[in-house]
């Protein structure tokens, strides 16, 4: 049986902090698959228990839930239990990569470059002076397990550190304080093990926050952004990072240059945005993959 003969569900929405983005991605993906003749139904998981997918006759899932159970391995495990193939990474890679702290530990273990960090756990005392002595200023403070820059603060003074940590702790029990990387910011899509052109992100404000990602029309995206040599360099790094954490199908890996122009790994997005602002389709388009074809390819890679 071909995939076009199967009943496919696009899962989107949900209840994570990234719900609104996922609704937009879900609408775009559902429309693309319908235009290609697939038997597809969009399902907002906020109002639909996942365990009822089998009763509904669903045979395959396109997962476009951002954050929460859609990216932390819970949905992936449930679908495997039901025997339903799904797009994107498996249980282990999904669980690990939503946790920025453990992702960075895995990269560091094999010698891949990533910004220096200090970990703060809920209930621990925060020694701001000691942290700044180690990392310098400015620093970025972020929850370990949130996406879309939710709860992220750029801290420029010692006095700002504690309030920033307290804000991040609203979203997670583990918070990362990371050394600032002064260079350019890139996001690098990977499709079926092939690294696509890096997209340089130039936000209007201090950094690429939620507003810059999904609301602002003033964020600039440059693609292709690198010379052939630099693209080859970042591709080698990103491919290694992708393989270390066990990604499959598709993912997007964020990278930043330090002051000397060296690439540093930031984080993995195992369920990349697919909205009008989204980076993955912008990059794919530059190598001749239109939006509908990209969506279809991701679906074909489901397992």
UniProtKB/Swiss-Prot annotation:
Binding site for Mg(2+) 2: 267, 269
Subcellular locations according to the entry: Cytoplasm
GO biological process: cell wall organization; peptidoglycan biosynthetic process; regulation of cell shape
GO MF, any single term: D-alanine-D-alanine ligase activity
Enzyme class at the top of the EC tree: ligase
Associated pathway: Cell wall biogenesis; peptidoglycan biosynthesis
Binding site residues for Mg(2+) 1: 254, 267
Catalytic activity: 2 D-alanine + ATP = D-alanyl-D-alanine + ADP + phosphate + H(+)
Binding of ATP, residues: 132-187
Cofactor binding comment, as recorded: Binds 2 magnesium or manganese ions per subunit.
Keywords: ATP-binding, Cell shape, Cell wall biogenesis/degradation, Cytoplasm, Ligase, Magnesium, Manganese, Metal-binding, Nucleotide-binding, Peptidoglycan synthesis
Domain ATP-grasp: 104-300
Protein EC: 6.3.2.4
GO CC term (a single one): cytosol
InterPro entries registered for this protein in UniProt: ATP-grasp, ATP_grasp_subdomain_1, D-Ala_lig_Van_CS, D_ala_D_ala, Dala_Dala_lig_C, Dala_Dala_lig_N, PreATP-grasp_dom_sf
A Pfam entry, by short name: Dala_Dala_lig_N
Cofactor: Mg(2+); Mn(2+)
Function, as annotated: Cell wall formation.
Family classification: Belongs to the D-alanine--D-alanine ligase family.
Name assigned to this protein: D-alanine--D-alanine ligase
Species of provenance: Actinobacillus pleuropneumoniae serotype 5b (strain L20)
Taxonomic path: Bacteria, Pseudomonadati, Pseudomonadota, Gammaproteobacteria, Pasteurellales
